[in-house]
């Protein structure tokens, strides 16, 4: 493992959006690395807000593989989300879920287990710090991710109209 000072830093903002819950949803990612900004979004026709929040974080961490292809490894990632579900889930709750065989404290199956497993796997590949940011509070990175997530919703709705 490299020392923190040797690692390349990546700052990521993610967001999910849903019109109805469940309903058409979208996710958005704004990634800053080495003076470059990458923005991308997507969506699903029938989903939930929590699935979209998780998918945004997953897509963001998957994008890091393209940075690795360019020789960037051992990335120090600061991932900002306005979803306490994602932030607390990946940094606090997941440890108990795994110990209990992907069950919650009250012995119910963890919702979105496949997405949580994927997020857990991806987050192990780098040094990821998870930050919660209050949504719709004027934070530029979060506001941009929110706009991208809404573009994801619109892309799904426009496909339905075709």
Swiss-Prot record:
Binding, Mg(2+) 2: 15, 146
Keyword flag Magnesium: yes
Molecular function GO terms recorded: magnesium ion binding; nucleic acid binding; RNA-DNA hybrid ribonuclease activity
Domain RNase H type-1 span(s) in chain numbering: 6-154
Cofactor(s) for this UniProt protein: Mg(2+)
InterPro entries linked: RNase_H, RNaseH-like_sf, RNaseH_domain, RNaseH_sf, RNaseHI
Reaction(s) catalysed by this chain's protein: Endonucleolytic cleavage to 5'-phosphomonoester
Keywords: Cytoplasm, Endonuclease, Hydrolase, Magnesium, Metal-binding, Nuclease
Comment on bound cofactor: Binds 1 Mg(2+) ion per subunit. May bind a second metal ion at a regulatory site, or after substrate binding.
Gene Ontology biological process: DNA replication, removal of RNA primer
Family under the similarity heading: Belongs to the RNase H family.
Biological function: Endonuclease that specifically degrades the RNA of RNA-DNA hybrids.
HAMAP family: RNase_H
Listed NCBIfam families: PRK00203.1
UniProt name for this protein: Ribonuclease H
Originating species: Nitrosomonas eutropha (strain DSM 101675 / C91 / Nm57)
């Amino acid at each position: 493992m490299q020392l923190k000072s040797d690692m390349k830093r990546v700052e990521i903002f993610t967001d999910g959006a849903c019109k109805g819950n469940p309903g058409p949803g979208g996710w958005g990612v704004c990634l800053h690395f080495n003076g470059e900004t990458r923005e991308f979004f997507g969506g699903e026709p029938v989903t939930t807000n929590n699935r979209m929040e998780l998918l945004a974080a997953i897509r963001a961490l998957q994008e890091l593989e393209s940075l690795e292809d360019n020789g960037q490894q051992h990335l120090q990632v600061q991932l900002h989300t306005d979803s306490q579900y994602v932030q607390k889930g990946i940094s606090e709750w997941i440890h108990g879920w795994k110990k209990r065989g992907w069950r919650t404290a009250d012995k119910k199956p963890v919702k979105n287990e496949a997405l949580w497993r994927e997020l857990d796997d991806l987050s192990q590949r780098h040094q990821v710090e998870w930050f919660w940011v209050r949504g719709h509070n004027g934070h530029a990175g979060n506001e941009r991710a929110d706009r991208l997530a809404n573009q994801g919703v619109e892309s799904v709705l426009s496909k339905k109209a075709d």
